[in-house]
């Protein structure tokens, strides 16, 4: 770390889904932590049972973790010592704009505008095709002293909440953000690596979900592990090309938030994106899958990723194929055949 920080931070995690809850549990094992849930009944149940029965059933949460449905109360927890505090946004991409807009009104009034802030969502905003840092900049960029970054990496929330080992990357141009996240989470079961490549980390986190859907489709079609390995490898090339066009550092895609997260999401049994792909490959329709309650960020952001890539003239054949299957009625096997029929070309380690 670039400078020494106190042993104790005040942490507020905003968003009580599976990932927000898991990070709050990890932070609360060493630091005073408040988890904010928008749903009052959910917050009350979590506080009473020390369990998030909606998103992480069966996982016991630390008794030290405070849960509140009052955003003002969660932020007031930080106001006692704003110089030694951290805000973690645990909401999905779709929740970033409303939450950041609300924070823009609240943080300066409480003297919290310079508190380090990180988001954890992965994907492109559906309506705008923005990456999360662009959403944060649009909502909070005018706030003086803003220090922000992204926390990402190969991680299933349930395992983190259970205290199993995980390695994550915090990316920010601010050393205060990198240091605060390391202080809050780095410990026996959580290893934090630091980076300055916000764009690269975000592109990896977004596109790996789309590639994981493709890998699930491949597995659902029983095309074998060779085909899955090819999709993972060429999917990584798509991530690197997209990142290069946006100014990302290429080495980021060989790290935790690129290759690491892609392998986990494309192969892990807990991966929702892979499960959706498996169902598609087995012949189910997307509408039926979504109606059953199964959700996946790869479905939400696939079109936005494709549209932004087209606007930038970036070639993303796997992403294009996933969109054609999900939204345009192309059969999975026809999509595979089209990918295999592409013109032969040299393989290059660079985009």
Swiss-Prot record:
The gene is gpsA. Gene3D superfamilies: N-(1-d-carboxylethyl)-l-norvaline Dehydrogenase, domain 2, NAD(P)-binding Rossmann-like Domain. It is found in: Cytoplasm. Its EC number is 1.1.1.94. Its main location: cytoplasm. It comes from Bordetella pertussis (strain Tohama I / ATCC BAA-589 / NCTC 13251). Pfam families: NAD_Gly3P_dh_C, NAD_Gly3P_dh_N. The keyword Transmembrane helix does not apply. It is an enzyme of class 1 (oxidoreductase). InterPro entries: 6-PGluconate_DH-like_C_sf (IPR008927), 6PGD_dom2 (IPR013328), G3P_DH_NAD-dep (IPR006168), G3P_DH_NAD-dep_C (IPR006109), G3P_DH_NAD-dep_N (IPR011128), NAD(P)-bd_dom_sf (IPR036291). This is Glycerol-3-phosphate dehydrogenase [NAD(P)+]. One of its GO terms (molecular function) is glycerol-3-phosphate dehydrogenase [NAD(P)+] activity. Keywords: Cytoplasm, Lipid biosynthesis, Lipid metabolism, NAD, NADP, Nucleotide-binding, Oxidoreductase, Phospholipid biosynthesis, Phospholipid metabolism. Signal peptide: none annotated. Belongs to the NAD-dependent glycerol-3-phosphate dehydrogenase family. The keyword Secreted does not apply. GO terms for cellular component: cytosol. Pathway: Membrane lipid metabolism; glycerophospholipid metabolism.
